[in-house]
C-alpha cells in the first residue's frame, strides 16, 4: 500500500511541531522499512533491523540540575542533530555503539551506508544487506554532528562551531535528550566509535561524559562508557605529520629518484624545526609547516605523462594503491558515496526518516565550511587526553588499515611510543601480541587479517590490505575488531616463539556462537560416553549433533549474503554503468534486484552442496596450524574465547625482526640530512606476505565531479 508524499509531509510537520515541545517519544522515531528503496527486495526479513531516525533538538529540555541555573546558549536554539539507529530484530544486545565520521564536517551516513551499518547502497540508490554489519554485536546509532554536518540543521546558520570544547558540549546535550527518548539505553555498555577526525571527537566526548557523570545528581543514571574505538584516527597532528615522508619512503611511494624529492626533505625538516621551537605554553592545535607535507607529497607523486588517464593522475591519500584525479586525490573515493547521495535524493526517503524535506539541506558527504571553522583556538589535540582516559579504566582500541597514507600506521605507532600512561611510556615489556586470522565459515577458508597489540587498556590493530575506511574494504573482517574486544574470538596459544593467534569468524550474531557452542557441549556430554564402560562409542558418537550442525550450517548459508563483495563489483562496473544510472526506471531496477537475488540463491545453493563436514573442518583447521605455524602435535585450541587480561606473554615470545620503519632499512636514506627515530614497535607488515595480494590500481570514473579541493582528513 503506497503512502502519499503529502501525507508523509503532514506527518513530518506534526513530528517537527512535537520537537519544539520537548514531548518526543521513542515511537515518534520509528522508521517503516517498506518506505526505503530496496528493502522490499530483501528476501530474508531477519536481515532487516529495527530502525529509528529523525532530529533530536539540542534544546529539547534541560535534564541536569546544573543546567537549570544556566542560560542556554542561543547557538543551540532550533539546532537539531540527525541520528539513525539500528537494532537487531531478535538479539537484545547489552552494547550501544555511537558511530561518528570525521572531516570535520563529514556525515556519519558514510558509516551507516558505506561501512559498518546493516545496509549498503547499490548504484541505483537501493539498499541491500551488508553481511559485515556491526548491529549483530550491538545497537548502532549514527549521528550527523557538529552543526552543519549531513542532515543536521540549525536555524542560526551559519552558526558553525570553532572549537572542540563547544562540539563536546553539544554532544552531551544530544546524549541527554537521546537518553530521555530512549531511557532503556542507559542500562547498556556504551562504545563510542568512529574514524579519521573522530580521533579528535571521541576522546573529547569521552572526557565530557566523565565530567557529566561527576556533575549529575546521585538519583540519575550515569552514562556507562566502556570503550573507545578509533579507526585510522587523526589524533596527534604533529607526530602524524612527521610520519608522512618516512612512511611514503617505506612503501616505495617516493625515493631519491622522485622529482622534487629534495623539496620533500626540506619540508619535513621545516616541520621538525618548527616543533623543536615550540614553547610549553604554545596553544596551537596544529602547524601549517607540518600540515603542508601531505599536500606536497601528493604533488610530487603526480603522473603528468601524456597517456595517463585524467582520473589516475595522483595518488589516493586514503589508499595508496589507488589513483584519482587532481586535485581530488581521494576525495572522489569511494564511488559508493555517490550511491548514498542518490539514496537520500530518492523521493520519500527523507520523509521516511521522520524529517521535513523542506527544512533539511540536500545531503552531501562533507561540508567544507564546518572544516574551515573548526580551527580549535582553545583546545589542544586529543592525544593529550588519552593517558587520563586509559588510567580511568576505559578501553581504547586504535585500528588502522595499512594502506592508508593520511592517517598511516607509522603515525599511530610513533604516537603510542611517546604516550605515557599507567606507569610506562609506550607499549611495555609485558605487551601482548597476536596474529589475527579471519575464518569464513561459509566458504571454509581462512585469510590473514592483521596483527593485534595490547597493553594496559590500549589495543592497536593493523588490518591487512585495508584503506582509511577499513570496514568499506573489509566489511566482515572489520567486524572482528568488535569481536576481539568482546572476547568473541578463538585463541590458539603456540609453543613456538611466534605470537599466538586470534581467529574471528563470520558467525552472524554473538548469541548464535554462544548457543551453538553450548549445544555442542551438551551433545558431547550426552553422546560422547556410553553406559557401562565409560568409553566413547565410535559408531554412535555425535550423530544427532552432527545432523543438527549440518542443518544449522545450511541455514546459515541461506542467510549469508554475498553483498560483502559489492564494493569490488560496483567499482568494476561503474565505468560502464554510471552513464546509465539516471536513466534506469523502476522496472529495470526491480529486474536487477530480482536477478541479483537469483544469483545469490544459486551461489548459496552451490556452497551448501559442497559444504565440508564440521568435524572435517576442525581437522583441516588443526592441520593448517600445524603446517603453517609450526604448532606441536600435542597442542590444540586451549580455550574457546580469550581475554586480554590473561597472563602476559614473555618478551622473547615474539619475532625479533627489525621494523621496516627503521631508517636503516630504507634503500634511499643515505643522503638524508635529517634524523628520524627508529620505530620502537616490531613491524606489523612482516607476516604472511606470501598470502597478501596487492591490489591493482582502480580508476575512479572520469565523470565524477572533480571540483573538490584536496581531500580532508
From Swiss-Prot:
InterPro entries: AB_hydrolase_fold (IPR029058), Peptidase_S10 (IPR001563), Ser_caboxypep_ser_AS (IPR018202). Residues 500-612, 650-696 are annotated as: Disordered. Residues 686-695 have a biased composition (Basic residues). Glycans are attached at residues 457, 465. Residues 512-522, 553-601, 668-678 have a biased composition (Acidic residues). One of its GO terms (cellular component) is trans-Golgi network. GO terms for biological process: apoptotic process; proteolysis. The keyword Glycoprotein applies. Its EC number is 3.4.16.6. GO terms for molecular function: serine-type carboxypeptidase activity. Residues 638-713 are cytoplasmic. It is found in: Golgi apparatus, trans-Golgi network membrane. Keywords: Apoptosis, Carboxypeptidase, Glycoprotein, Golgi apparatus, Hydrolase, Membrane, Protease, Signal, Transmembrane, Transmembrane helix. Residues 23-616 are lumenal. It is a single-pass type I membrane protein. Residues 523-552, 602-612 have a biased composition (Basic and acidic residues). The chain crosses the membrane at residues 617-637. Residues 651-667 have a biased composition (Low complexity). The active site is at 196, 404, 468. Gene3D superfamilies: alpha/beta hydrolase (3.40.50.1820). It catalyses: Preferential release of a C-terminal arginine or lysine residue. Residues 1-22 form the signal peptide. The keyword Glycoprotein applies. Belongs to the peptidase S10 family. Protease with a carboxypeptidase B-like function involved in the C-terminal processing of the lysine and arginine residues from protein precursors. Promotes cell fusion and is involved in the programmed cell death. This is Pheromone-processing carboxypeptidase KEX1. It comes from Vanderwaltozyma polyspora (strain ATCC 22028 / DSM 70294 / BCRC 21397 / CBS 2163 / NBRC 10782 / NRRL Y-8283 / UCD 57-17). The lineage of its organism: Eukaryota, Fungi, Dikarya, Ascomycota, Saccharomycotina.
Amino acid at each position: 500500500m503506497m503512502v502519499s508524499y503529502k501525507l508523509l509531509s503532514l506527518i513530518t510537520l506534526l513530528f517537527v511541531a512535537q520537537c519544539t515541545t520537548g514531548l518526543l517519544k521513542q515511537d515518534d522515531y520509528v522508521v517503516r522499512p517498506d518506505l526505503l528503496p530496496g528493502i522490499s527486495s530483501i528476501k530474508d526479513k531477519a536481515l532487516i533491523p529495527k530502525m529509528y531516525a529523525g532530529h533530536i533538538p539540542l534544546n529539547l529540555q534541560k535534564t541536569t540540575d546544573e543546567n537549570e541555573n544556566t542560560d542556554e546558549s542561543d547557538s543551540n536554539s532550533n539546532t537539531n542533530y540527525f541520528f539513525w539507529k539500528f537494532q537487531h530484530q531478535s538479539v537484545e544486545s547489552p552494547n550501544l555503539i555511537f558511530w561518528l565520521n570525521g572531516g570535520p564536517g563529514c556525515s556519519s551516513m558514510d558509516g551507516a551506508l558505506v561501512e559498518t551499518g546493516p545496509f549498503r547502497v547499490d548504484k541505483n540508490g537501493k539498499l541491500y544487506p551488508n553481511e559485515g554489519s556491526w548491529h549483530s554485536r550491538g545497537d548502532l546509532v549514527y549521528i550527523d554532528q557538529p552543526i552543519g554536518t549531513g542532515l543536521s540543521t540549525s536555524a542560526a546558520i551559519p552558526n558553525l562551531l570553532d572549537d572542540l570544547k563547544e562540539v563536546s558540549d553539544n554532544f552531551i546535550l544530544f546524549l541527554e535528550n537521546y537518553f530521555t527518548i530512549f531511557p532503556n539505553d542507559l542500562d547498556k555498555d556504551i562504545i563510542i566509535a568512529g574514524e579519521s577526525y573522530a580521533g579528535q571527537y571521541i576522546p573529547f566526548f569521552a572526557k565530557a561524559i566523565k565530567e557529566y557523570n561527576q556533575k549529575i545528581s546521585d538519583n540519575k543514571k550515569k552514562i556507562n562508557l566502556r570503550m573507545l574505538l578509533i579507526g585510522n584516527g587523526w589524533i596527534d597532528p604533529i607526530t602524524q605529520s612527521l610520519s608522512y615522508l618516512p612512511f611514503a619512503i617505506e612503501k616505495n611511494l617516493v625515493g631519491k629518484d622522485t622529482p622534487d624529492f629534495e623539496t620533500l626533505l626540506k619540508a619535513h625538516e621545516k616541520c621538525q624545526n618548527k616543533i623543536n621551537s615550540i614553547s610549553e605554553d604554545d596553544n596551537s592545535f596544529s602547524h601549517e609547516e607540518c600540515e603542508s607535507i601531505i599536500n606536497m607529497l601528493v604533488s610530487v607523486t603526480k603522473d603528468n605523462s601524456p597517456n595517463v588517464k585524467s582520473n589516475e593522475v595522483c595518488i589516493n591519500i586514503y589508499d595508496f594503491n589507488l589513483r584519482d584525479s587532481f586535485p581530488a586525490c581521494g576525495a572522489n573515493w569511494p564511488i559508493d558515496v555517490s550511491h548514498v547521495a542518490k539514496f537520500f535524493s530518492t523521493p520519500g526517503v527523507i520523509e521516511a526518516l521522520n524529517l521535513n524535506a523542506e527544512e533539511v539541506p540536500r545531503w552531501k558527504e562533507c561540508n567544507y565550511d564546518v572544516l574551515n571553522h573548526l580551527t580549535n583556538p582553545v583546545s589542544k589535540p586529543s592525544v593529550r587526553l588519552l593517558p587520563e582516559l586509559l588510567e580511568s579504566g576505559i578501553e581504547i582500541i586504535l585500528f588502522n588499515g595499512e594502506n592508508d597514507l593520511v592517517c598511516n600506521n607509522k603515525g599511530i605507532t610513533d604516537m603510542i611510543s611517546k604516550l605515557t600512561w599507567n606507569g610506562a611510556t609506550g607499549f611495555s615489556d609485558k605487551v601482548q601480541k597476536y596474529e589475527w586470522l579471519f575464518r569464513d565459515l561459509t566458504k571454509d577458508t581462512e585469510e590473514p587479517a592483521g596483527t593485534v597489540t595490547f597493553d594496559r587498556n590500549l589495543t592497536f590493530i593493523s588490518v591487512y590490505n585495508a584503506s582509511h575506511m577499513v570496514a568499506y574494504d573489509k566489511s566482515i573482517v572489520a567486524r572482528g575488531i568488535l569481536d576481539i574486544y568482546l572476547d568473541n574470538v578463538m585463541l590458539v596459544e603456540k609453543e613456538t616463539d611466534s605470537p599466538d593467534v586470534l581467529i574471528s569468524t563470520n558467525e552472524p550474531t554473538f548469541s548464535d556462537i554462544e548457543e551453538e557452542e553450548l549445544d555442542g557441549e551438551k551433545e558431547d556430554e550426552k553422546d560422547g560416553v556410553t553406559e557401562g564402560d565409560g568409553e566413547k562409542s565410535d559408531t554412535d558418537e555425535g550423530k544427532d549433533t552432527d545432523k543438527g550442525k549440518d542443518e544449522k550450517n545450511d541455514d546459515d548459508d541461506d542467510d549469508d549474503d554475498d553483498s560483502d563483495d559489492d564494493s569490488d563489483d560496483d567499482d568494476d562496473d561503474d565505468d560502464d554503468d554510471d552513464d546509465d544510472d539516471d536513466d534506469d526506471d523502476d522496472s529495470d531496477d526491480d529486474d536487477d534486484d530480482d536477478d541479483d537475488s537469483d544469483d545469490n540463491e544459486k551461489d548459496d545453493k552451490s556452497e551448501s552442496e559442497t559444504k565440508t563436514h564440521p568435524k572435517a573442518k576442525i581437522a583441516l583447521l588443526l592441520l593448517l596450524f600445524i603446517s603453517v605455524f609450526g604448532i606441536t602435535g600435542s597442542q590444540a585450541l586451549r580455550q574457546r574465547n580469550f581475554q586480554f587480561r590473561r597472563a602476559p606473554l614473555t618478551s622473547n615470545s615474539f619475532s625479533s625482526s627489525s621494523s621496516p620503519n627503521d631508517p636503516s632499512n630504507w634503500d634511499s636514506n643515505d643522503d638524508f640530512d635529517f634524523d628520524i627515530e627508529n620505530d620502537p614497535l616490531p613491524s606489523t607488515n612482516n607476516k604472511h606476505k606470501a598470502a597478501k595480494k596487492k591490489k591493482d590500481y582502480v580508476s575512479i570514473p572520469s565523470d565524477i565531479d572533480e571540483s573538490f579541493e584536496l581531500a580532508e582528513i
